[in-house]
A protein has these predicted regions:
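S-adenosyl-L-methionine
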Residues: 1-38, 42-43, 49
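Class I S-adenosyl-L-methionine-dependent methyltransferase module
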Residues: 49-132
Length: 132
């Protein structure tokens, strides 16, 4: 069933605009759906379920970690981002900081890409560019 969920991030080169074109090209009787260039996961989130086995992958391990944490530890992730302020000082702390746990790394990555110009995590923008 198509539910058209939205990704929690925007990603350069994402397939957000192509998902309605891609969906009819995928056979309905597949046993596994593998997303090798996952990016913002727009195609994966477009349907409630593509197959019994769904695999998200991307060359950028920070993306993989972010979506793994959101899937398996959503409450911890929400709790961590609930009180984040969009200040330049905090952006610089996140940009230059060292984060130990996978949850901390996911929050760091999410904060940087949602509060940076073009979602690249390099230049601070005062307002978030996407919302969870």
């Amino acid at each position: 069933m198509t539910i058209d969920r939205k990704s929690l991030i925007n990603w350069v080169g994402g397939k957000r605009l192509l998902r309605k074109v891609i969906e009819p090209l995928v056979p309905t009787d597949i046993k596994s759906y593998i997303e090798p260039f996952g990016g913002g996961a727009w195609v994966l989130f477009y349907k409630e379920k593509w197959a019994d086995l769904e695999v998200y992958n991307d060359l950028d391990g920070r993306l993989v970690n972010l979506f793994r944490i959101v899937k398996y530890h959503p409450n911890a992730f929400k709790e961590e981002i609930k009180y984040l302020l969009g200040s330049r000082e905090m952006f610089l702390q996140f940009l230059n900081g060292t984060f130990i746990t996978d949850i901390q790394k996911a929050v760091q990555f999410y904060f940087l890409i949602t509060r940076s110009y073009g979602g690249r995590g390099e230049t601070f923008v005062p307002a978030p560019t996407s919302r969870p």
